[in-house]
């Protein structure tokens, strides 16, 4: 007999304690500067709602969501199950017509510089022996002995060339090095493969 009544009484007791603690807390906040906090008043919390109002609002929102979901399910069930396709005559397809840019042909990549005239930058002058067009550049070729391949990788200042050597002031004489390569074994007990 006590087994069925005891949980009910316990629930009623807990709900009374929670309700009375909310009333005490709300009443103490109205005292302001005369509270137990020693003259400091932080004011009411902005945006804080009471527990009772929040549950009622949540309950109403939950019921509205359930009604909306039920209405969606009702209308969804009314739809036919097969897919509806558009008529092919009603579709409009966009045709892409290729037109090349003015002054360019389809084989533009093959002839990059046919008749390109060189216009120097402002403030620069062309030397008399410098080629003016790419056709003249093919005729003007410096001697391969004059071209040092190392100047491509190292140039001290733009427009100047320098014979770069590994150590300044020294030139390597390759004639003095032996033509055959000498193989030396290591002192470790490793075996060569």
Curated annotation (Swiss-Prot):
Belongs to the pyrokinin family. One of its GO terms (biological process) is neuropeptide signaling pathway. This is PBAN-type neuropeptides. The keyword Secreted applies. Residues 1-19 form the signal peptide. InterPro entries: PBAN, Pyrokinin_CS. Juvenile hormone seems to allow PBAN release, which then induces pheromone biosynthesis. Residues 186-193 form a propeptide. The keyword Secreted applies. It comes from the Eukaryota. One of its GO terms (molecular function) is neuropeptide hormone activity. Residues 124-158 are annotated as: Disordered. The modification Isoleucine amide is found at residue 46. Keywords: Amidation, Cleavage on pair of basic residues, Hormone, Neuropeptide, Pheromone response, Secreted, Signal. GO terms for cellular component: extracellular region. Its main location: secreted. Residues 138-151 have a biased composition (Basic and acidic residues). Disulfide bonds: none annotated. The modification Leucine amide is found at residues 102, 122, 158, 168. Pfam families: PBAN.
């Amino acid at each position: 007999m006590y087994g069925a009544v005891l949980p009910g009484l316990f629930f009623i007791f807990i709900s009374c304690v929670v309700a009375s603690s909310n009333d005490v807390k709300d009443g103490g906040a109205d005292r302001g500067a005369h509270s137990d906090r020693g003259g400091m008043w932080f004011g009411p919390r902005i945006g804080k709602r009471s527990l009772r109002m929040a549950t009622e609002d949540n309950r109403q929102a939950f019921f509205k969501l359930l009604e909306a979901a039920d209405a969606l399910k009702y209308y969804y069930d009314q739809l036919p199950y097969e897919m509806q396709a558009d008529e092919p005559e009603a579709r409009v397809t966009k045709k892409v017509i290729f037109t090349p840019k003015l002054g360019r042909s389809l084989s533009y990549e093959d002839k990059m510089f046919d008749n390109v005239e060189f216009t120097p930058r402002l403030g620069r002058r062309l030397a008399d022996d410098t080629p003016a067009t790419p056709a003249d550049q093919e005729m003007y070729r410096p001697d391969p002995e004059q071209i040092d391949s190392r100047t491509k990788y190292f140039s001290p200042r733009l427009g100047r060339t320098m014979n770069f050597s590994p150590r300044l002031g020294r030139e390597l004489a390759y004639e003095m090095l032996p033509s055959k390569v000498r193989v030396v074994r290591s002192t470790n007990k490793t075996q060569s493969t």
